[in-house]
Amino acid sequence: MEPQPLELEQVSGAYDPKNRILYVQYRGHITSEITTQVYAWISALISTYGLVPVQGSIFDFREVTNFVVGNLSTTQYQSYQLNNQVDLSDHPVALLVNNIYQRAMVKAALNVTPQQERKRIVHSMEGALAFIHDWHQINRQAG
């Protein structure tokens, strides 16, 4: 059974079984409410399916025009909650951006969330997929 996709006006999310990637695409204004809904969806997916089949996640911010005030603290809180419920230490996350504003806002979120080394800002889908692949190659060799 395939995981249910997330479809809202400002965000969509789906699991790609071929690449084994969880893909979330944001659009327009990102609010605290949107962030909370995304984390609730991810938490429900993990509760139902676990993390084993998933190689990594790609969060695509390229169509975001505004990160609304309060979203940073919500991201920090939701990330902290999820990391306390589930061991995500072997789950790489690529954060896809298109411009300086998106990069600055995503970088600020990275600075307030745990396990930064498994997260990377990238500028293309190819870069996102390569980061996830390389993460597993490096960690397999180190482990």
What are these regions (language model features)?
Residues E2-G143:
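Amphipathic, Lys/Arg-enriched alpha-helical "gate/interface" segment within cytosolic domains
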